[in-house]
């Protein structure tokens, strides 16, 4: 897309929202409580603040204020207010390609708000536990929050991810013409690294004329030992392993498709 000469500030709002899910099976009530306590501590308000602070560096944001809170019995939230200084559009990379991974993050430039809320929960009887993190990165100006996508998914180990990206409002060029988007995008997947795309089955639902983009991701490989909490698969009978595998896989598909699947 040809670079635009704008009349004043870039008034477009770009919002990236996504849910990240981690799934686990805990055999006993004590193990379920242990998983909830473990995941609640792993992603407490301080850890989330560190992750979002790095996110600010990726999208080029100046932090104005940080509000964080751990909740009882579980859960946490962090909201960071950020500002954008005038940036020379010639210095901004608007091409459609993956953002940096955690080990390659560097600070540059400067951006509206970034927030995260966590929701640990468990099935009352079935041993299934899920951890959900809701994240929103919303910016005003020339820099896309999609640049933070790679980093956030890598930081929050994810079995299932649902992502929404939307560009709202309009900005004017020097001739007064309105522009409702200022960068090319065909799919959110184009902002992911090849190694990430190789790990997930993905599907897009995009409404191009409304500048709305949606991608769902489901981890391809299933290894039972990665989903057991304080129990090794070899400690179970073959029948128990099959029952637990079926439960986990059904749970993951229901979350991925957003609907309950009847038992066969």
From Swiss-Prot:
Active site: 112 (schiff-base intermediate with substrate), 117 (proton acceptor), 140 (proton donor)
Enzyme class, first EC level, given as a word: lyase
Cofactor(s) essential for the protein: pyruvate
E.C. number: 4.1.1.50
Gene3D superfamilies per the UniProt record, alphabetical: S-adenosylmethionine decarboxylase
Domain of life: Bacteria
Cofactor note text: Binds 1 pyruvoyl group covalently per subunit.
Biological process annotations from GO: spermidine biosynthetic process
Pathway(s) of this molecule: Amine and polyamine biosynthesis; S-adenosylmethioninamine biosynthesis; S-adenosylmethioninamine from S-adenosyl-L-methionine: step 1/1
InterPro entries recorded: AdoMetDC_fam_prok (IPR003826), S-AdoMet_deCO2ase_bac (IPR009165), S-AdoMet_deCO2ase_core (IPR016067)
Catalytic activity: S-adenosyl-L-methionine + H(+) = S-adenosyl 3-(methylsulfanyl)propylamine + CO2
Sequence positions bearing Pyruvic acid (Ser): 112
Keywords (A to Z) from UniProt: Autocatalytic cleavage, Decarboxylase, Lyase, Polyamine biosynthesis, Pyruvate, S-adenosyl-L-methionine, Schiff base, Spermidine biosynthesis, Zymogen
Role summary: Catalyzes the decarboxylation of S-adenosylmethionine to S-adenosylmethioninamine (dcAdoMet), the propylamine donor required for the synthesis of the polyamines spermine and spermidine from the diamine putrescine.
Family from the record: Belongs to the prokaryotic AdoMetDC family. Type 2 subfamily.
Subunit record text: Heterooctamer of four alpha and four beta chains arranged as a tetramer of alpha/beta heterodimers.
Record-given protein name: S-adenosylmethionine decarboxylase proenzyme
Organism: Klebsiella pneumoniae subsp. pneumoniae (strain ATCC 700721 / MGH 78578)
Lineage: Bacteria, Pseudomonadati, Pseudomonadota, Gammaproteobacteria, Enterobacterales
């Amino acid at each position: 897309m040809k670079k635009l000469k704008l009349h004043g500030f870039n008034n477009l709002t770009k919002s990236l929202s996504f849910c990240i899910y981690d799934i686990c099976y805990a055999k006993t009530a004590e193990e379920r409580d242990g998983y909830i306590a473990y995941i609640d501590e792993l992603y407490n308000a301080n850890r989330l603040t560190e992750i979002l602070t790095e996110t600010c560096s990726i999208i080029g944001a100046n932090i104005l204020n940080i509000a964080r809170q751990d909740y009882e019995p579980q859960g946490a939230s962090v909201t960071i207010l950020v500002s954008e200084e005038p940036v020379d559009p010639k210095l901004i990379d608007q091409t459609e390609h993956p953002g940096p991974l955690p080990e390659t993050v560097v600070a540059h430039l400067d951006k509206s708000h970034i927030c995260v809320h966590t929701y640990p929960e468990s099935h009352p009887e079935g041993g299934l536990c899920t951890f959900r993190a809701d994240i929103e990165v919303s910016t005003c100006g020339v820099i896309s929050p999609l640049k933070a996508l790679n980093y956030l998914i890598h930081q929050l180990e994810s079995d299932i991810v649902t992502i929404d990206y939307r560009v709202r409002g309009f900005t004017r060029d020097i001739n007064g013409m309105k522009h409702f988007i200022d960068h090319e995008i065909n799919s959110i997947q184009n902002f992911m690294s090849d190694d990430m795309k190789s790990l997930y089955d993905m599907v897009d639902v995009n409404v191009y004329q409304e500048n709305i983009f949606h991608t769902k991701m489901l981890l391809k490989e299933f290894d039972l030992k990665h989903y057991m909490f304080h129990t090794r698969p070899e400690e179970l009978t073959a029948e128990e392993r099959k029952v637990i595998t079926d439960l986990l896989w059904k749970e993951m598909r229901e979350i991925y498709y957003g609907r309950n699947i009847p038992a066969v």
